[in-house]
């Protein structure tokens, strides 16, 4: 299987997001990379399901709370940005203050 660099990056992000989801399900608090991967992978999947940019921006802010992440992580993450593919092309999705 031959993947472009972008496809490899998306696959790695998906894998990291799945690992973060498993850790969250076990009750572990997520660290910085796990938090970014968790939110990003959920956004990419929601875009694939047909959600709009505006819907993704709102959805991304509902995925995690301060109780889901390690102390200080919420203050470290001001925005999460991800390029997602939509029927009309690739767009940048920005979620402001994703952990509330």
From Swiss-Prot:
Pfam families: Urease_gamma
Gene3D superfamilies referenced in this protein's UniProt entry, alphabetically: Urease, gamma-like subunit
E.C. designation(s): 3.5.1.5
Classification via InterPro entries: Urease_gamma, Urease_gamma/gamma-beta_su, Urease_gamma_sf, Urease_subunit
Cellular component annotations (GO), alphabetically ordered: cytoplasm
Localization per record: Cytoplasm
Pathway given in the UniProt record: Nitrogen metabolism; urea degradation; CO(2) and NH(3) from urea (urease route): step 1/1
Enzyme class: hydrolase
GO molecular function: nickel cation binding; urease activity
NCBIfam families for the chain: PRK13241.1, urease_gam
Subunit structure of this chain's protein: Heterotrimer of UreA (gamma), UreB (beta) and UreC (alpha) subunits. Three heterotrimers associate to form the active enzyme.
Family note: Belongs to the urease gamma subunit family.
PANTHER family in the record: UREASE
Name of protein: Urease subunit gamma
Native organism: Flavobacterium johnsoniae (strain ATCC 17061 / DSM 2064 / JCM 8514 / BCRC 14874 / CCUG 350202 / NBRC 14942 / NCIMB 11054 / UW101)
Name of the gene this protein is made from: ureA
């Amino acid at each position: 299987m031959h993947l472009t660099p972008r496809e490899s990056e998306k696959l790695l992000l998906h894998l990291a997001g799945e690992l973060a989801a498993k850790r969250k399900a076990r009750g572990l608090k997520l660290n910085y990379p796990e938090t970014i991967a968790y939110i990003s992978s959920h956004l990419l999947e929601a875009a694939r399901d047909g959600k709009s940019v505006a819907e993704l921006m709102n959805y991304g802010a509902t995925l995690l709370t301060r109780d889901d992440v390690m102390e200080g992580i919420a203050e470290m993450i001001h925005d999460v940005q991800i390029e997602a593919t939509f029927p009309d092309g690739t767009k940048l999705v920005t979620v402001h203050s994703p952990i509330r």
